[in-house]
Amino acid sequence: MSENEIKGILGTKLGMTQIFDEENRVIPVTVVEAGPCVVSQIRTVETDGYNAIQIAYGEIDPRKVNQPLTGHFKKAGVTPRRHVTEIRMDDVSGYEVGQDVTVEIFNDVKFVDVTGTSKGKGYAGAMKRHGFAGQGAGHGNQAAHRRVGGIGAAATPGRIFKGKRMAGRMGNDRVTTQNLKVQKIDADANLILIKGAIPGNRGGIVTVKTAVKGGAHA
């Protein structure tokens, strides 16, 4: 496995705090409890058409695992885990089924991409959901201060185009934040401190991978 190989791990967002760097500057960081995970399957070009490792994370009562997953974990020779994901990579020769994956894989990584589920906001208007400026605030506005305004549906085309930004359910989407700096790694506590904010609530499950736009090939 080369140094520039894409690496990834599952973890839990614990929350945000701040630390000080060598020049005594305050750095806002998100603390992620990353792993330990276990390799539950290896996919190769010969058998699956692509290279990837499947990693499993999180404790779960074996009685709560359905039959297909129970058989899958039994075949791999690992205890059942709550969360499973795949990490695609060019070379899987450095991994084997049953191998532990810890936060130490990021020791030589400077930047990461973090994928999680954003906070659900419920039904939101266009100003909050899309950042629209809104309309006039004066008395002449007939109760349309925060409305969308024109939506482009005149006689032609006679309909509203798909994807038109309007009010609706906001959040609870799969979101990836790219090129976040790895500020610190605590291998003993399975913690990775990432500069800035990452998607999701405290306690949410996130996937941390080497950055595709620089971190993995810097």
From Swiss-Prot:
It comes from the Bacteria. GO terms for biological process: translation. It holds the Pfam family Ribosomal_L3. The keyword Iron does not apply. GO terms for cellular component: cytosolic large ribosomal subunit. Part of the 50S ribosomal subunit. Forms a cluster with proteins L14 and L19. HAMAP family: Ribosomal_uL3_B (MF_01325_B). One of the primary rRNA binding proteins, it binds directly near the 3'-end of the 23S rRNA, where it nucleates assembly of the 50S subunit. Belongs to the universal ribosomal protein uL3 family. This is Large ribosomal subunit protein uL3. It comes from Corynebacterium efficiens (strain DSM 44549 / YS-314 / AJ 12310 / JCM 11189 / NBRC 100395). The lineage of its organism: Bacteria, Bacillati, Actinomycetota, Actinomycetes, Mycobacteriales. The gene is rplC.
